[in-house]
């Protein structure tokens, strides 16, 4: 044992063991994830216990309870052979974020813009109790009667035309964008008129309550249009949080609007529409089962339509607004595996999916959506020598969010973060570098180098910026949640791989953004 233990200690940085990887278990097997290469390996029980000690306590034990010296020697030999053959557990502690040169960044902003999102209005006809724009949510604007002018909308479309590559998306946001349907329609028509020789697509998110047969017919008739439709499940669950500005539930209007759109799109509804469901606490199997049964019971809703199910935004719902109607009675909401409990939605969806055979079921879609990031993770033969900037996009390249006054933000989720330009002067390269590269890199790199999930991280600017720039206290809280979620995704992925490998084969067809 001492021979292989000594070799391992001489080769890897035991003191920084917490950054080298993590271990996780499914119902049937034990695994390790290697930070440097992105590889995942199945482990024997003894190897698992050694690696768990390394990753969680930064120690390589000389003895393990219940394990003989010979068995421990064999386990260390196996680990050493993997270190040699697969180059695992060998991460440099001082990596730097990949950074575009000024010239590359300038070219991406000028010639490769992918999406422009227009905030048509700050007004909404609803007052969802979990909405980030409610007065009790700091760091975000409140609802207001502000609306985008035609001049701003026109300039935003021209900016999209002039700074995009072979394809570009024009999207609409609010408030509720259908409050300004005539402006939305005028903007779509103008976009189709001036953007030629490119693949042009459109999209908007809606609470569905303002959809009429006429609006649905127009929307469905726009080539390249897609709709993100917000509905939270059956009437009791939906109306607990999604209420009109006067406090009345919105379910009846929302379900009617959804039906109008499905009828207008016809066969194309399954690929042109996405259902977005927000789940609020308490997170019970009773509530999640009710949501599942509701969507599966709508005979007119295409089974193949993508249905997303996710948590309410962090800190956006007040304790006094929480509805306890679907609290359940202590039933299963997350499976515990070696001391790690899968989060409520993930644990519930995984358990239900493993019980079902239908690859088009509601839970199958949720599980597949959460597995794409693990499936497409960065994998290398030898440890990577750099770091991606977590889940952050290249500011001003992936998308630009145009506020009602014409200012550019990174996206619709960044709240009161520093702007990056406007429709009159274009993207501001210096602001982008100052706030979203220099400051982010300087304040984040040390912590990222210490984190085993750094190459799987989905955390982006939206989670950690305020008016003056990055908020590291907020970011570090969100980091913990992301690590937790990432381990859950690893468990789900390898659980499905063990029991329903055909699902993993189909993931290549799932879009990854």
Ranges and model annotations:
Residues 50, 57-70:
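Short acidic, hydrophobic short linear motifs in intrinsically disordered regions
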Residues 239-255, 259, 263-391, 395, ...:
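Radical SAM enzyme [4Fe-4S]-AdoMet core and its adjacent flexible, acidic
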Residues 70-78, 93, 97-217, 222-225:
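Conserved alpha-helical substructure of the radical SAM core
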Residues 77-100, 391, 396-430:
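A broadly conserved sequence feature marking short terminus-proximal activation segments
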Residues 92-112, 374-382, 417-442, 453:
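Short, charged low-complexity linear segments at domain edges
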Residues 3-42, 71-117:
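N-terminal [4Fe-4S]-dependent radical SAM core
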Residues 4-7, 12-20, 407-408, 413-513:
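Flexible mid-to-C-terminal extensions adjoining Fe-S/redox cofactors in radical SAM and related proteins
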């Amino acid at each position: 044992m001492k021979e292989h233990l000594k070799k391992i200690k001489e080769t890897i940085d035991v003191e920084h063991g917490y950054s080298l990887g993590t271990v996780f278990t499914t119902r049937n097997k034990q695994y390790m994830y290697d930070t440097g290469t992105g590889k995942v390996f199945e482990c024997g029980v003894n190897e698992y216990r050694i690696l768990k000690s390394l990753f969680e306590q930064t120690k390589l034990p000389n003895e393990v309870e219940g394990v003989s010296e010979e068995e421990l020697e064999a386990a260390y030999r196996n680990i050493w052979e993997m270190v040699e053959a697969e180059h695992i557990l060998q991460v440099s502690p001082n990596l730097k974020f990949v950074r575009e040169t000024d010239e590359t960044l300038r070219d991406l902003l000028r010639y490769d813009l992918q999406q422009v999102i227009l905030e048509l209005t700050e007004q909404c006809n609803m007052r969802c109790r979990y909405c980030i724009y409610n007065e009790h949510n700091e760091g975000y604007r409140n609802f207001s009667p502000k609306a985008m002018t035609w001049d701003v909308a026109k300039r935003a479309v021209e900016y999209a035309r002039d700074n995009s590559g072979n394809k570009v998306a024009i999207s609409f946001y609010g408030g509720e964008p259908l409050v300004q349907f005539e402006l939305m329609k005028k903007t779509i028509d103008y976009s189709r008129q001036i953007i030629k020789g490119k693949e042009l697509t459109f999209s908007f998110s809606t609470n569905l309550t303002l959809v009429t047969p006429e609006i649905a017919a127009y929307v469905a008739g726009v080539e390249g249009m897609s709709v993100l439709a917000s509905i939270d499940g059956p009437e009791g669950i939906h109306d607990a949080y999604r209420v009109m500005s006067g406090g009345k539930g919105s379910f009846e209007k929302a379900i009617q609007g959804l039906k109008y759109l499905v009828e207008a799109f016809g066969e194309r509804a399954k690929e042109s529409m996405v259902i977005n469901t927000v789940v609020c606490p308490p997170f019970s199997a009773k509530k999640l089962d009710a949501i599942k049964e509701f969507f599966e019971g709508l005979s007119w809703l295409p089974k193949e339509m993508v249905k997303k199910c996710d948590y309410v935004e962090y800190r956006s719902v007040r304790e006094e607004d929480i509805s306890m109607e679907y609290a359940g009675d202590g039933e299963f909401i997350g499976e515990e595996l070696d001391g790690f409990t899968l989060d409520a939605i993930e644990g519930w969806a995984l358990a239900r999916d493993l019980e079902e055979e239908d690859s088009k079921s509601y839970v199958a879609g949720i599980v597949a959506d959460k597995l794409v990031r693990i499936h497409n993770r960065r994998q290398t033969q030898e440890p990577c020598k750099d770091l991606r900037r977590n889940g952050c996009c290249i500011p001003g390249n992936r998308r630009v969010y145009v506020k009602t006054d014409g200012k550019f933000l990174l996206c619709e989720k960044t709240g009161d973060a520093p702007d990056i330009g406007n429709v009159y002067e274009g993207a501001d390269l210096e602001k982008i570098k100052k706030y979203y590269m220099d400051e982010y890199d300087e304040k984040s790199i040390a912590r990222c180098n210490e984190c085993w999930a750094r190459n799987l991280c989905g955390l982006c600017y939206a989670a950690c910026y305020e008016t003056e720039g990055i908020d590291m206290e907020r970011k570090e809280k969100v980091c913990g949640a992301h690590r937790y979620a990432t381990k859950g995704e690893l468990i789900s992925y390898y659980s499905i791989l063990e029991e329903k490998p055909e699902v993993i084969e189909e993931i290549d067809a799932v879009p990854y953004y």
